[in-house]
Amino acid sequence: MAWFKTALAAYGATALFILLWSSGAIFAEIGVTHASASTFLTMRFALATVMLALIGAWRHRWLPARGTRVHVAATGALMMGGYSICYFLALERGLTPGLLAAILGAQPIATLIITERRFSAMRMAGLFMAMLGLASIVFRGASALNPSTTEGLALALAALASITAGAIMQKRIVQEPMDVLPLQNFVGLLLSLP
């Protein structure tokens, strides 16, 4: 019975994460049609900050370990602030969620290219094919862009750069996610304030 609870916790958390993450683009597009990107993000980060503060109070841990807080905050500035702000502004400027998702789909590939020290021929061929596939989708979608949505494309690339740099920095953090998320989310809230 214990193995079932462990499996349910592991797979349930993973399934919940995938559900929440994948539905994000849909709710983001709905959100920016009814509020500015700044207002929507401020409300989103404020709600998450309250929820994380409640969890922190229950756990009796509010902040990451001393000596890591600046790095954790800088990582949050990129992953929570930079990524989210650029993402929502790209939608607000008219970039479609599909094109935005295709551009951001390059993040794992970009992270691997930057962090990998040795590449096998097979891995390079796979990365090249993945980049070609993404590029064909992005260029097909970008060809329909008008000058007003070109800014959205630049913001999508800034979101990609932010999430890639943040993911690389996050790899150096060896604390539990619940030890770093409250501070990272709070930094995102501060950056999103109008």
Located regions from the model:
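Glycine-/small-residue-enriched transmembrane alpha-helix faces in small-molecule transporters
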Residues: 1-42, 86, 132, 145-172, ...
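Residue-level signature of transmembrane alpha-helical cores of multipass secondary-active transporters
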Residues: 13-14, 71-76, 101, 127, ...
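Specific transmembrane alpha-helical segments of multi-pass solute transporters/efflux pumps
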Residues: 20-25, 53, 57-100, 136
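A helix-boundary/kink motif common to multi-pass secondary transporters
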Residues: 36-37, 95-96, 176-179
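Specific alpha-helical transmembrane segments that line the substrate/conduction pathway
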Residues: 39-50, 84-122, 159
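Juxtamembrane helix-start motifs in multi-pass secondary transporters
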Residues: 40-41, 179-184
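Hydrophobic transmembrane alpha-helices of multi-pass small-molecule transport proteins
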Residues: 52, 75, 106, 119-141, ...
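C-terminal ends of transmembrane helices
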Residues: 52-63, 108-120, 164-175
